[in-house]
């Protein structure tokens, strides 16, 4: 549970520090929460009340084009469908699986063959390096026919590999893994993408399609308690790489 005054302050900081220049809609809505007693009281009543969770829950229920666009519309929506918002917020946690990070991680991978372990893997899309197409200026790597096209500007002496390393084994670990064949889970993952970030959404949709033919295994578990058991499953005769995509990106 939260304090309504603290909720207002938190949402104002979220608007100014995270949404400004990145999402006009979330900027407006977060600012409106910071000035609205009724909505702040509603959010404060939730065990998990972070802004991304609240806004993604609304996007899940409405779809991005139909989200409330003003403070008064948000208040009316919460008044009308607050029970549904509450149910989503209690059942879900925010998830991201930004495959664009693979373009930044790729130059850091050692030559193959590799065994990859990603912690905080979500749906495991960040494990599928060889299924995406990469463009580092005039240098192209990866699957030429991939629906996922990743462009990355390389400045300075970036050691680009001659090809995507061969990956012979991969495994993810996440507290709440996403199954790419679970339509409800996929809809939630897409709802966590901010509404204006259409290119990111297209990348995510393409990566989900690429994963469905042969999805990576993502074990349910905690980094501290369960990582050793995952590492023990990796083959001994290849280079083991353990990563979390936000660390290097």
Language model: regions and residue ranges:
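Short N-terminal helix-initiation segments at or just after the protein's N-terminus
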Residues: 1-6, 54-59, 184-188
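Conserved SAM/SAH-binding loop
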Residues: 221-226
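Distinct, well-ordered alpha-helical segments
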Residues: 227-231
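Generic alpha-helix detector with strongest preference for long hydrophobic helices that associate
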Residues: 3-10, 39, 82-90, 170, ...
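Non-catalytic nucleic-acid substrate-recognition regions in nucleic-acid-modifying enzymes
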Residues: 1-24
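A short SAM/SAH-binding and catalytic strip from SAM-dependent methyltransferases
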Residues: 239-249
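Class I SAM-dependent methyltransferase Rossmann-like catalytic core
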Residues: 12-17, 27-32, 36-113, 125-133
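Class I S-adenosyl-L-methionine-dependent methyltransferase module
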Residues: 44, 63-64, 91, 95-96, ...
């Amino acid at each position: 549970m939260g304090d309504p005054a603290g909720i207002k302050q938190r949402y104002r900081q979220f608007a100014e520090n995270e949404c400004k220049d990145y999402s006009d809609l979330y900027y407006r809505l977060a600012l409106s929460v910071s000035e609205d007693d009724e909505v702040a009281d509603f959010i404060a009543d939730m065990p998990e009340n972070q802004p991304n969770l609240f806004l993604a829950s609304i996007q899940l229920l409405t779809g991005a084009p139909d989200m409330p666009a003003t403070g008064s519309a948000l208040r009316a929506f919460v008044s009308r469908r607050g029970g549904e918002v509450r149910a989503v917020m209690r059942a879900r946690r925010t998830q991201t699986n930004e495959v664009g990070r693979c373009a930044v991680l790729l130059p850091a991978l050692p030559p193959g063959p590799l065994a990859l372990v990603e912690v905080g893997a979500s749906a495991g899309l960040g494990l599928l390096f060889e299924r995406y197409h990469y463009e580092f200026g005039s240098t192209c790597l990866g699957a030429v026919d991939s629906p996922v096209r990743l462009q990355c500007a390389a400045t300075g002496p970036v050691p680009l590999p001659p090809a995507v390393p061969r990956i012979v084994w991969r495994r993810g670990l996440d507290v709440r893994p996403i199954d790419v064949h679970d339509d409800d889970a996929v809809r939630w993952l897409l709802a966590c993408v901010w509404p204006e970030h259409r290119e990111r959404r297209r990348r995510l949709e393409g990566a989900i399609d690429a994963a469905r033919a042969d999805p990576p295994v993502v074990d349910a578990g905690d980094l501290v308690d369960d990582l050793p058991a995952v590492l023990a499953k990796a083959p001994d005769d290849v280079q083991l790489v353990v990563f979390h995509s936000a660390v290097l990106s």
